[in-house]
Amino acid sequence: MVFAIIFSVLTTLSEGMFHTSYETEVDTSVVACNQTVDSMIYCLQTDPELLSERFFVGLGKQEDKKKNAFYLVWKESTYVPEEQYSRLVLDVLVDEKPFMKDVVIESSVVDTMAGERRDVRVDIHYAGTLIKEAYGTFHINPVGENQSTLAMDVHVKFGWFFRIFISRKVYSETIDWRLVRFVENLKLISEGVALTEEYWTEQDAAMVAQ
C-alpha cells in the first residue's frame, strides 16, 4: 500500500536570501535518528557515492521537467581533517543540460548538543560564483521513548547571476522539495525503510492522484 507523504514547508525570501524550514515526526528513538545522521555526516566527508546512493534517493532528475530547471550533480568529496572541512565537487545543470562543471564547494560541520536536542550545522565557506552565502542546521530532538523529530533550517543566497535566474517560483519547484525530501529520507532510513527510486515514484504518483 502506498501512503502519500503530506508535508508543510515554510520558505521566505528576504534581500536575496532564501530561508527554508521544515519539521517531521519520526517513529523511532532519538538513538536511531542520531545513528542515521552520523552515517550521513560520515558519507558527506568521505564517500559521496554512498551518500548519493543512500541519502539522495529520489532527489535527481524527475519526470516533471519543471523540477529539473536547476539541480546539482554530486561528483566527489574530500575531507581535510587538519582543517576540519570538506571539499566537494559538483556540476550544475540548467534545464537538464550542463551549465557549470566541477564547481568546488568548501564546507564545515559543527555538531553540538543543546540539552537533549542535537544540532548539526553545515556552513558553506566557498562556492565560487554559485553561492554567496549558505548555511543550514539539522535538529534532532526526542519527544518520547520511540518518538523523535527531525527539523531543518536552511539559508541560501546565490551568486549574483543565479539570483537573476532563480526566482521564488524556480526555487520552490527545484530546491524546496529536494530539501524536504532529504529530511524525509533521513526519517525513513531511521525508521528502517529500505529506500529505492521506485519507492518515491510510487509516493509521487499517489500525491498526484489525490
Question: Which positions does each model-derived feature cover?
Answer:
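Glycine-rich portal/gate segments that line the openings of hydrophobic small-molecule binding cavities
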Residues: A32, Q62-T129, E184-Q210
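Mobile, glycine-rich extracellular loop/lid and propeptide segments
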Residues: A134
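Terminal "cap-and-tail" regions of soluble proteins that handle hydrophobic small molecules
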Residues: V2, L10-C33, S39, T137-Q210
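Hydrophobic ligand-binding cavity/cleft-lining segments
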Residues: V2-R87
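Glycine-rich loops and low-complexity Gly/Arg-rich segments
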Residues: E53-F56, M113-R117, S148, T174-V180
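Generic structural signal for short, flexible, solvent-exposed coil/loop and linker residues
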Residues: E15-T20, M40, L59, S77-Y79, ...
